[in-house]
Amino acid sequence: MIVRLFWLAVLWLALANANPLKRLNHVWSQRGVAKDDFLVTSLPGLSENIASDDVPLMFAGQLELYPENNTHYFFWKFSDQKKEPEAANRTIFWLNGGPGCSSMDGALMEAGPLRIGKDYKVQLNEGSWHRKGDVVFVDQPAGTGFSYSRDYDVELYQIEYHFLQFLKKYFELFPEDAHNDIVLAGESYAGQYIPYIAHGILERNKKLADGESPYHLKGLAIGNGWISPNEQSLSFVPFAVQAGLVSQKDPGWKAILQQHMKCQDLVAASHEDDTFGANSVVDKECEKVLNTILYELVDHSASQYEQCINMYDYTLRDSFPSCGMNWPPDLSNVNHFLKSDEVMSSLNLVQQISWTECSEHVGKQMKARHSKPAITLFADLLAEVEILLFHGNRDIICNYMGAESMIKKLHWGGQTGFSADSPVLKWFHGDEEAGYVKSERNLTFVNVFDASHMVPFDKPEVSSALVDILFKRFTVADDKLQTQAKKTNANQNDSPSASENDNESGRTSESASSSPSESAATETESHATRIVRLIQLAVIIILIWGLCAIYSTYRSKPTSIIKTKPSGRKKNVQWADLMPQEEPAPKGFLSKTLNKLSRTEHKYVPVDIELGPTDGMDDASSDSGPSNVGTAETPEFVIASDDEENAHEHTEEH
């Protein structure tokens, strides 16, 4: 009996300390806290379509920010294996807008090294920004793309605060990058995000805690940004006239002009009482100006898919009332790619989420009712960092004329606007005239020719040179600014669609993206994991044998081994592993474009340019004050459209 009890005690200790379920739970809870947990070594087409020395070193996954509300931000980092010296210590964080539109648009259709073909396999983007520094694409705020949380942000200062927390966690994961030069880049509604985040970084640097190091913020690069709602809203009609889209002779001119005047009156009033200018990132009446233009210019005689102007590229047509929300063409490929189980596994998703381009829930919550437009931060930012604003000249919703008007009224560095004698430089990238540039007092404005709302989509090679302009890597002579085109042995086209390019690169190993040290680390970890699993299997076998032996002994005895009290009742005895266990707690219009929340194609709704929420959105979250955080209502995130518009009021972003 004593021997049996001894072995029972041994088995119980083994169960308590080597329980495979307990071990599995521990391993799962620790997943995502080590760098190797985020390594990406395989993707469909990676070895098939991309030469080994062009395969970027990649890390991706959902990084935990706050365990208390289960907040995780998804990121995808790309590093060039053949870094140029000037790019060796630089990290570019890229954000798309919405609010609520995934930065995977930027990663797979714009500034990243990969494009997705019609076969849903990756292809090389020769104009990738990762040649200019490590590029990290971040899905934020929580609820966007592959990021998740139980709470939603409702104000821009929350975006700022939570992104600083992301940076803290990110540099803990990649301490070797903590002293890199930082660039914040993005487009559309990121024109609100980026200045706020930059402001947060600069304020943090002024009051560091013991042991903290400053973040080396060197510049901002904002493409077709929604920065000043007043000036951008008042630019729709002048831009449409200048582009030849509308004239006073058109039947719809009166309706367009009337809506423009309503917006103009609101803006004028805001200059007097500071209501609109200071406290509204998007105004409904001004949203309707672009809606009215698109509606009045519908060509009912055209085919179904060409009745409306594409608000992101006025040289293209789309169905009505989509008016650009079915663009760009690569979106369907990206959507299929990111919903693949194979891809989600390769991207190290702890919580697999069905990817959507834009989240309606995020857009509904992120109303920014108590946030000043980002333009109010520019004067202070320009005193400390370089800011580059670049605009594709074919975009309507965040057009370059609105940006130029904004700059003319902006007071910074002791004066208003660019100096009268500030030169306008023709920009040549290689032999191509790519646009024009104005630069003064830390602010650079670039108009990019033949480009849409998504400049890197249309002009990948040209767009990567914008980083060179930001860091003054160019020459100037005879009013001409010259950037160096990438040297190549073959002719390369700035094609906007990966599906049109067939890359016939040499075949490489799927693990070519990892360095030898990382491969060794992964191999060692895999070996250790196998040993642990063998030990677990042995423990399970011993446990089963022990339990069987005890049961056999119990069945063979003529009397119970449990003594009874005088009452004759047996004691209530339970084995330790059979006792109840405590269950762990389960673990408008500008709104439409800026947040393409739902892709409605046969029903007209006001344009929602991925800039913010639409008229039909719930206002409940704003009633309780600026500190409120929205609560996630559903576990599923829904896609809007490629440019980041709400389906409730069409229009914008990426």
Curated annotation (Swiss-Prot):
Glycosylation sites: N69, N89, N442, N503
Subcellular location per the Swiss-Prot or TrEMBL entry: Golgi apparatus, trans-Golgi network membrane
Ranges of Low complexity composition bias in the record: 508-523
Catalysed reaction equations from the record: Preferential release of a C-terminal arginine or lysine residue
GO cellular component, one term: trans-Golgi network
Side of membrane Lumenal, spans: 19-533
Major site of localization recorded for this protein: Golgi
Family: Belongs to the peptidase S10 family.
Protein's name according to its UniProt entry: Pheromone-processing carboxypeptidase KEX1
